[in-house]
């Protein structure tokens, strides 16, 4: 039982990292709350499904194209919507949330509901970790979860674009004075964040079925992880994902699965009340309250 | 120049420190302000003057030390509680309500619990009267009553009027102690020379004042005691003449001697 | 400047009649009185006549009432967002709390609607204010996020602990005695909320609340507690929202977790932004547009939400002033292009 919790809690945490990292990245770099995050997550899943099943492309190509598509959607959302309301936080939230609704409810209207749509798993095999059986999709999830964090970290450290992103995150004005295009960088950030959401969808969806409701759930999970970890703090996001991942798995193991969401919602509310800058963030308190 | 020297301390600051991480913005500063005093606080930029004020008025919590008002410990109390006790401040970066007319800016402090309790303005606290009282106060501060100035949006007023509006907010609260954070800065010489008599008048009405200033010449016309800060520490304190001749103060202000 | 292109700028000038009717002299001529009163009279007349016109079609009567319900929720949102500076994404919280409170009062304690609605409004507003009290120091996006979570948490708690009727909710709640009671009760309440709040924001107490939005540091320096001021404002907003919820459940005789549904948080925002933020009347106008629209789209299921969301996004991004501010400008000012 102990190893069960250890392993599956770890998997749950890795899934949360995947779900939240894109949201955290976008907010961290350009201070843009992308509330369409969950919608992009679901939408990418459906694109992959449609390319694979309706168009009949090979699965690897469908995956690749759908991830590119999610990046494209991110760029579009930035240039059509976010750029015009940038700086007005509340408008950003409302506009991105509304666009997310358009995607999700549009899919629902188009008839995607219920448990009929599934994505194939990468492999059917099962491995044993500490004698706990884990299917290969979940192994992949763990590996990719951390690979992505490592990749983004390397990106920000060693590429020009990555350094521009990092510079923007620290001080937008100073970065602009050094010749970094604020719009382009923010668009890249939103695109990267959306692609991360897409990758997460393509790894996590095969474990269950494609449903529109996942979009709302993922958004709340992403917000929970980012708020508890400190909005915009990447290290905080990872730590918070573990705290929340394990506590979620514990509620499933010992209580009712119903409480999974309650845990997340309470975590958001409690964190914002007690320490709005998050438990692992390094942002100044003064920014969000006096 | 103030002539009240009853030596009744109303504000006592004892070894106050405020550290931001490793930076000692204010370090072990003590100061006693007596009733009727006009105390000037001088020092180069970054010497901790505004931080000190923020600690006194509750906008920041001091790391160490105490502040007491009328012998009552007020360290770390909430800003509105301290304002309610009669310590009122102006902001260096003026903070009017830009979307309201100038006189409505004063209706806010006139609606505060302190204004209702202490009252004393002609007309008192009833609704409708506050507008009149607000215009009265503005007139006292040099807003011409019959001009349109008191009724203009605060956002459209020039700096000189905004500074007066900051003072007006303090006056509306019937303060015992006004702390001015650089009221003279950013003003022209003629604007300053019209503000100086106003400060003297308020002091004459029995209001104790602490003034942070860079404009030493004007400050020394009104202040009866001066404290000099440098890097968060108190350099010296005393009569204006003593302070200005203190070698460390001269050193800190070297290069700006034309001010004296 | 030596460029050949002539530049133009749009100049706006107050109409003569607007300036004349600003002061007491407006009473000089009927034309000016009419100019001043027409918009108000039109609004009031529309709502007073609505039940009389719609009485042969009870279904559309209910739609008319839905306009009022949404208008109340939107007024509550507009007041909080644009007069206090607290953008709440959780309007459904007020609505649901009011609804459940009235349901319990009516079914468990047997209070008739005449009592259960006002009591639920007051108790509900008290509950909401207490629940939001710890969040009041939060600003901007942080307050928005936390309020978005409150109604979601309520549904999950009701589901998980199976309290307050669980997923089923309450049924068999008393309805109103007659069509016109139901209609005019709500319309009257909407007018009270609308004109009451409009008056309040211009009184000294309302001014203090607006000052908090403008500059809370100055309010603190004026010896006024910002948290207490915000709490008062939240209480007023939750009164409005809770009343809407309490009234609605008596209209339909049941309440369920759908009272905390997301639509109820999104629709008021859409109505406010479309109608014109910061006007309090705008939200009523927005509601009067959105509710009938949603009736026509009823057969299209979730396409309804897609249409709302698109319209909402369009307004947020391209026409953020909303209809009311646009119309006011056209009514009061002439525009022309001037060469510069």
Please provide the spans of the model-predicted regions.
Chain B
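Catalytic Walker B motif of ABC-type/P-loop ATPase nucleotide-binding domains
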Residues: 178-181
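Conserved catalytic motifs of ABC-family nucleotide-binding domains
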Residues: 174
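Conserved ABC transporter NBD signature motif
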Residues: 65-72, 85, 138, 151
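Helix-to-loop junction immediately C-terminal to a conserved catalytic motif
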Residues: 57
């Amino acid at each position: 039982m102990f190893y069960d919790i250890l392993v599956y809690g770890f998997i749950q945490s890795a899934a949360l990292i995947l779900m939240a990292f894109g949201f955290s990245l976008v907010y961290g770099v350009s201070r843009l709350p992308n509330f369409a995050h969950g919608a992009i997550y679901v939408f990418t899943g459906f694109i992959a499904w449609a390319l694979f099943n309706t168009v009949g492309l090979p699965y690897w190509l469908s995956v690749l194209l759908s991830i590119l598509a999610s990046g494209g959607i991110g760029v579009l959302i930035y240039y059509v919507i976010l750029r015009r309301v940038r700086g007005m936080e509340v408008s950003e939230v409302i506009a991105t949330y509304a666009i997310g609704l358009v995607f999700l409810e549009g899919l629902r209207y188009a008839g995607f509901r219920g448990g009929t749509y599934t994505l194939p798993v990468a492999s059917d095999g099962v491995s044993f970790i500490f004698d706990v059986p884990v299917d290969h999709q979940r192994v992949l999830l763990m590996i990719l979860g951390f690979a992505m964090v490592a990749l983004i970290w390397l990106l920000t450290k060693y590429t020009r674009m990555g350094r521009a992103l990092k510079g923007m995150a620290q001080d937008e004005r100073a970065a602009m004075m050094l010749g970094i295009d604020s719009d382009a960088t923010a668009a890249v950030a939103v695109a990267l964040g959306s692609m991360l959401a897409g990758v997460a969808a393509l790894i996590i969806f095969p474990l269950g079925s494609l449903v529109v409701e996942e979009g709302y759930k993922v958004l709340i999970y992403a917000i929970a992880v980012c708020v508890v970890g400190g909005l915009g703090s990447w290290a905080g996001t990872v730590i918070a994902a573990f705290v929340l991942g394990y506590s979620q798995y514990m509620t499933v193991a010992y209580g009712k699965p119903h409480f999974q969401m309650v845990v997340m919602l309470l975590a958001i509310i409690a964190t914002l009340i007690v320490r709005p800058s998050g438990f692992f963030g390094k942002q100044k308190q003064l920014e969000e309250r006096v | 120049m103030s002539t009240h020297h009853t030596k009744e301390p109303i504000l006592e600051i004892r070894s106050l420190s405020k550290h931001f991480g490793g930076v000692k913005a204010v370090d072990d500063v003590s100061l006693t302000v007596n009733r009727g005093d006009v105390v000037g606080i001088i020092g180069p930029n970054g010497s901790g003057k505004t931080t000190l004020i923020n600690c006194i008025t509750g906008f920041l919590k001091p790391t160490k030390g105490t502040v007491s008002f009328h012998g009552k410990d007020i360290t770390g109390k909430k800003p509105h509680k301290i304002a309610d006790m009669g310590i009122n401040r102006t902001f260096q970066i003026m903070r009017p309500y830009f979307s309201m007319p100038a006189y409505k800016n004063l209706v806010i402090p006139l609606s505060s619990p302190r204004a209702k309790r202490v009252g004393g303005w002609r007309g008192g606290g009833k609704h409708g009267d506050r507008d009149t009282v607000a215009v009265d106060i503005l007139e006292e501060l040099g807003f011409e009553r019959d001009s349109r100035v008191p009724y203009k949006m605060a956002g459209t007023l020039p700096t000189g009027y905004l500074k007066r509006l900051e003072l007006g907010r303090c006056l509306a609260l019937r303060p015992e102690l006004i702390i001015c954070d650089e009221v003279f800065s950013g003003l022209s010489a003629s604007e300053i020379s019209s503000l100086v008599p106003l400060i003297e008048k308020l002091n004459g009405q029995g209001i104790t004042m602490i003034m942070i200033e860079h404009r030493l010449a004007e400050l020394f016309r009104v202040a009866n005691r001066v404290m000099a800060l440098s890097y968060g520490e108190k350099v010296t304190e005393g009569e204006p003449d003593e302070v200005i001749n203190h070698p460390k103060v001269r050193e800190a202000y070297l290069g700006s001697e034309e001010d004296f | 400047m030596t460029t050949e292109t002539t530049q133009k700028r749009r100049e706006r000038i107050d109409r003569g009649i607007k300036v004349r009717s600003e002061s007491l002299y407006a009473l000089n001529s009927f034309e000016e009185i009419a100019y001043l009163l027409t918009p108000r009279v039109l609004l009031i007349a529309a709502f007073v006549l609505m039940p009389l016109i719609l009485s042969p079609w009870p279904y559309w009567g209910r739609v008319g009432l839905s306009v009022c319900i949404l208008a109340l929720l939107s007024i509550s949102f507009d007041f909080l967002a644009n007069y206090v500076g607290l953008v709440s994404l959780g309007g459904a919280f007020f609505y649901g709390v009011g609804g459940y409170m009235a349901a319990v009062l009516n079914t468990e304690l047997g209070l008739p609607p005449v009592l259960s609605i006002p009591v639920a409004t007051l108790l509900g507003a008290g509950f909401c204010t207490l629940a939001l009290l710890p969040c009041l120091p939060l600003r901007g996006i942080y307050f928005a996020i936390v309020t978005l979570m409150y109604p979601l948490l309520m549904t999950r708690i009701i589901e998980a602990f199976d309290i307050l009727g669980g997923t089923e909710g309450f049924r068999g709640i008393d309805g109103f005695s007659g069509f016109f009671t139901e209609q005019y009760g709500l319309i009257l309440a909407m007018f009270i909320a609308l004109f009451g709040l409009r008056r309040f924001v211009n009184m000294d107490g309302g001014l203090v609340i607006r000052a908090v939005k403008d500059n809370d540091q100055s309010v603190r320096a004026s010896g006024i507690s910002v948290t207490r001021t915000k709490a008062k404002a939240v209480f007023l907003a939750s009164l409005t929202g809770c009343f809407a919820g309490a009234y609605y459940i008596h209209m339909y005789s049941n309440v369920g977790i759908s009272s905390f549904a997301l639509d109820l948080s999104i629709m008021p925002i859409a109505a406010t932004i479309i109608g014109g933020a910061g006007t309090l009347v705008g939200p009523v106008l927005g509601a009067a547009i959105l509710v009938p629209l949603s009736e026509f789209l009823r057969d299209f299921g979730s396409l309804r939400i897609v249409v709302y969301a698109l319209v909402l996004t369009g307004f947020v991004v391209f026409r953020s002033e909303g209809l009311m501010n646009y119309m006011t400008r056209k009514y009061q000012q002439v525009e022309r292009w001037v060469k510069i």
